[in-house]
Curated annotation (Swiss-Prot):
PROSITE patterns: ADH_SHORT (PS00061). The lineage of its organism: Eukaryota, Metazoa, Ecdysozoa, Arthropoda, Hexapoda. PANTHER family: ALCOHOL DEHYDROGENASE. Homodimer. Signal peptide: none annotated. Pfam families: adh_short. The keyword Kinase does not apply. Keywords: NAD, Oxidoreductase. It comes from Drosophila subobscura. Belongs to the short-chain dehydrogenases/reductases (SDR) family. This is Alcohol dehydrogenase. Its EC number is 1.1.1.1. The active site is at Y151.
Amino acid sequence: MSLTNKNVVFVAGLGGIGLDTSRELVKRDLKNLVILDRIDNAAAIAELKAINPKVTVTFYPYDVTVPVAETTKLLKTIFAQIKTIDVLINGAGILDDHQIERTIAVNYSGLVNTTTAILDFWDKRKGGPGGIICNIGSVTGFNAIYQVPVYSGSKAAVVNFTSSLAKLAPITGVTAYTVNPGITKTTLVHKFNSWLDVEPRVAEKLLEHPTQTSQQCAENFVKAIELNKNGAIWKLDLGTLESITWTKHWDSGI
């Protein structure tokens, strides 16, 4: 899929991987890049505009933990402004297993709520045009970092939720896939808390292993968006992009 003249809404598009991905996106000659994030970063927005002045870059403050009704209200404003949204990227995330409720709220519940809100506009059963959802998971959604089970569990939930969305595409007209970064050099992993402090040096130990840069991750992130494969579970690790096969151990039969 060509991203030329597409309208993309990026939740948390100013974070570590998020900002580098936004930089790559504007190079693709989008029509609009709408960034939703908790904290405004005027310098980053200005930089994105300067990279490609042909792309309209706008920012709206957004906390993914707000009720669905609040998200729907914000999306209504965005649709009124740019008329159509082609791709929604759900990228909000925190890594701190001391914050159990917030980890689940940001990493999973917020993603579900944002998705639910945009379906109000996209669902073909309501006369919507359909759309594409790219959800950011993590390789910990496949195999947990067991010292951070809350974070890992939230990412496993993202993978399962998104796989379900993909199977619902014939009904809703909305396709979906996950991008799942491996350990990436960002502020997220430089210092974080393990669950019940089971490993005080978890961040330090993790970074002893091979990592990738956020730029490497961002380049493959955008490649995955361009490949636009419904139901794909993309692994973005050590500078590579790979579609993995989820092992089926049970089938509901429906």
